[in-house]
Amino acid sequence: KMSILEVNNVSKSFGGVKANVDISMSVEKGKIVGLIGPNGSGKTTLFNSIVGTYPIDNGSIKFNGKEVSELPVPVIAKLGLLRTFQQTRIYGKLNCVDNMLISHKGSDESLFKIFSKIPKELTEKAENLLNFVGLYQKRKLRAGDLSFGQQKLLELAMALMNEPEMLLLDEPTAGINPTLINGIID
């Protein structure tokens, strides 16, 4: 089976602190893989390197066979490789559906333009994904009024809005109550 992600001998330091040293791993298409380690062991740094947030010091990162280690975040995202964050990145003053619409990859445009011509299918897709993560009943609520766990579910739905080929989840269950966690895992 072909690997969707290949990380080869990747290292990243901040000043004198070595966050990642010669990390190598590959992930097959369609697999769910867990990266486990204590706090401060470099998991988030590796995620940031894979999606282009941190340039690597050496090594190689290939996504679908294409070297991506020199590419900027938006280009890597357009290739279908996305991540969520330990801290949620939502628009607190906007409702859940609007958050979903903004996250759609066509949203490099101004907000006014985004909201002035939303295809019905896009709104339906947003509502279906909100239903998938259990937030359909709260779709008209301001995102800032959701619990932390619900905000993480919203962020997951926002990432899925772009149908990524690969989604890196950074601490997806931190701060979420166990009932919601079981919903995510299902």
Model-predicted regions and their roles:
Residues 59-66, 79:
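Conserved ABC transporter NBD signature motif
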Residues 113-138, 183-186:
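Conserved ABC ATPase "signature" region
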Residues 167-171:
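Catalytic Walker B motif of ABC-type/P-loop ATPase nucleotide-binding domains
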Residues 36-38:
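The feature captures the beta-strand-to-loop junction immediately N-terminal to the Walker
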Residues 163:
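Conserved catalytic motifs of ABC-family nucleotide-binding domains
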Residues 51:
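Helix-to-loop junction immediately C-terminal to a conserved catalytic motif
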